[in-house]
């Protein structure tokens, strides 16, 4: 957590008032993120931003509907549709597939990155990732 706090401070990102989302909170966020991404990539990103801010900077408990609803609505998404997505099998299936892909790449957890045959873990690898993305873009244009 100290490393995350240091990076947040360096980048001017609020961080530190948190409620650990492990358990039901993670399940709720995965289900809503899966649903939001099916609506559009923009909706998925809007929910992710709202949820991350809520979890890591505002001490929102995403295992509780009152906090989850606030984060969904702040992302301009309809709560009733998001709530209906909770417990839907699609999110669990996608999470399992992602975990299998991570394992196959010899990775675990976040942040994990893969571009072609380049695989890396950790925010300290972001400069390498940026370089690989630039080279990949040049090779495909």
Listing of model-derived features with the role each one plays in the protein:
Residues 38, 46, 50-141:
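C-terminal cap of thioredoxin/glutaredoxin-like
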